Every structure is written in structure tokens, then in C-alpha cells.
From Swiss-Prot:
Its main location: plastid. Belongs to the universal ribosomal protein uS2 family. It is found in: Plastid, Chloroplast. This is Small ribosomal subunit protein uS2c. Disulfide bonds: none annotated. Transmembrane segments: none annotated. GO terms for molecular function: structural constituent of ribosome.
Length: 238
């Protein structure tokens, strides 16, 4: 895998608050190698290591995107949801930003069945078929469609398991992470000072609570994915 330059600036990360961890009482000792200091009762992440792992993650997603691989971005807490959706849409990735439904990956056949129902309902709604049903039946289907849109809207075009999963907030998305581990799907995780770096294939030590921090990390990864996709499109067109 070729190493590239991703314009990762320590100053930019500091401005986004990437270095701020959790209180010193709420930490995982396995994060010790990624912590550079304590300040006013808060652990401070070593941004040099953050830059190194973020660069490694960018190399990985660029290489994967240049080979036509598929990505899933997961971040369901309120502070991450909007950034996850906009980043995923920009890079043409799948995403989950409301709730991870247990078994979404490990019980893929059930998820696939739900997606088929979702697609059928969308088609029926677009063709105006729901408006021709009895009010009670139409109301039930509209509620079902709304539910699907909320929880499956970001994966509605998925036809199989993703090749790489990017996870925002390891603790919040623990179920998703465990499913990836079970299936052997590589993960890139933002890990705050209360996380376990050993659970991720590529851990990125960073503040997973600040919107600016989440957005900066996602923007770097998405930029690398977009460049990789451009490379893939160019190779296919030759």
C-alpha cells in the first residue's frame, strides 16, 4: 500500500479540539500510549500519533476505493449524525446515523429482506399506489415507509456486506463493532480516551464528542475515498 500525503495539520486538529479527551477518571488504561498529558483533570491525546493513524487510515481507504470497494460509516449519536450523513453522501458511502439495528450485519439475510420491502414500498409510494388504498391500509404502509427511511435510509442501496466500516464513537457503536469483528470486516474507529484501541483494525485517537473533531476526521477520510474513487473510475475508463 503506497503512502500518500494527506495534508493533516496539527494546528488544524488543535483548533477542532481533536486533542481533548475525557476526564482522567473515565479512561481506559489501554489508551495510555495515545495520551500525551493531563490538563485540568482531562486527558490530552497525542496529536502526532493521531496524525500518523489518520494518515494510515486515509491510505487504506484510498487503496480500497481505488479497487471499487464499499464503505459503511456508522455514527448514531446526535453530535455525529449530521456529519456522518453528509460525509457518506459526499463519498457515495453507505451510512447508519440513527440506530444500529442488532444483527444488521451478522443477520444479513434479515436486513436484505427489510431492504427489499423498503424498496418495494418506495416504488409503490412514487407511483402513487398508496394514495389509492383504504386510508387505514395507506397509513400503516406510510408509517412503515417512514420507519424504514429513518433506520435503513442510509443503506438502501446496499446489496451486500461492506468491505470497510468507519465507526464514530466506539462505545456508542459497540454492537456494530462486535458484528464487524465477528464477520472479519476491517474497522477504522475514532477512539477517545475511554475506548479500547485493540478492538479496531485502525484506531484514530481523537475527541469523539466534539462536532468539529468528528467532522475534521471524516472530511480527511472522505477526501481520500473520493480520490480513490476517481482513480478507480479513470482506470476503468481506459
Amino acid at each position: 500500500m503506497t503512502r500518500r500525503y494527506w495534508n493533516i495539520s496539527l494546528e488544524e486538529m488543535m483548533e477542532a479540539g481533536v486533542h481533548f479527551g475525557h476526564g482522567t477518571r473515565k479512561w481506559n488504561p489501554r489508551m495510555a500510549p495515545y495520551i500525551s498529558a493531563k490538563r485540568k483533570g482531562i486527558h490530552i491525546t497525542n496529536l502526532t500519533r493521531t496524525a500518523r493513524f489518520l494518515s494510515e487510515a486515509c491510505d487504506l481507504v484510498f487503496d480500497a476505493a481505488s479497487r471499487g470497494k464499499h464503505f459503511l460509516i456508522v455514527g448514531t449519536k446526535d453530535k455525529a449524525a449530521d456529519s456522518v450523513a453528509s460525509a457518506a453522501i459526499r463519498a457515495r458511502c453507505h451510512y447508519v446515523n440513527k440506530k444500529w439495528l442488532g444483527g444488521m450485519s451478522t443477520n444479513w439475510s434479515t436486513t436484505e429482506t427489510r431492504l427489499h420491502k423498503f424498496r418495494d414500498l418506495r416504488v409503490r409510494a412514487e407511483m402513487g399506489q398508496l394514495s389509492r388504498l383504504p386510508k387505514r391500509d395507506a397509513a400503516i404502509l406510510k408509517r412503515q415507509l417512514s420507519h424504514f427511511q429513518t433506520y435503513l435510509g442510509g443503506i438502501k442501496y446496499m446489496t451486500g456486506l461492506p468491505d470497510i466500516v468507519i465507526i464514530i464513537d466506539q462505545q456508542e457503536e459497540y454492537t456494530a463493532l462486535r458484528e464487524c469483528v465477528t464477520l472479519g470486516i476491517p474497522t477504522i474507529c475514532l477512539i477517545d480516551t475511554n475506548c479500547d484501541p485493540d478492538l479496531a483494525d485502525i484506531p484514530i485517537p481523537a475527541n469523539d464528542d466534539a462536532i468539529a473533531s468528528i467532522r475534521l476526521i471524516l472530511n480527511k477520510l472522505v477526501s481520500a475515498i473520493c480520490q480513490g474513487r476517481s482513480s478507480y473510475s479513470y482506470i476503468r475508463s481506459r
